[in-house]
């Protein structure tokens, strides 16, 4: 039924619960698992300090790489091979773009990973993914 599963992670407890569900589904269904981490620098983080901004970006990118490595290990320990994708941009759009590009049959995301102000202004990542996805979306609480 679900041959390709895409899951978005950001290191939060909710995204790790979503990953656990995605790993178990991939194992039970012998599905391909693709784990996406999108490095997101909120507009409030931008400044005129180019070197400082680059330093922040590099730190966030390194956190993303480390998070994906942990996710791949977690999947491997459950007997599932996970392919990882590291992107830069807006998280919901990165997850949606990857799902579309990969021809995903299912997207798995955690609920409520954003802060209160950002959620108020833009909605949560899970809400946007569920709203605009071309395939079924599982939102894990």
Language-model-detected regions and their locations in the chain:
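Solvent-exposed polar/charged
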Residues: 24-27, 100, 131
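A short acidic, glycine-rich active-site loop
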Residues: 52-66
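Glycine-rich, Arg-bearing micro-motifs that act as flexible, cationic patches
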Residues: 106-131
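Structural beta-alpha unit
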Residues: 73-107
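Conserved beta-strand positions in the Rossmann-like core of class I SAM-dependent methyltransferases
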Residues: 34, 83, 138
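Small/aliphatic-rich secondary-structure junction motif
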Residues: 3-52, 78
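Short beta->alpha linker loops
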Residues: 51, 86-90, 112
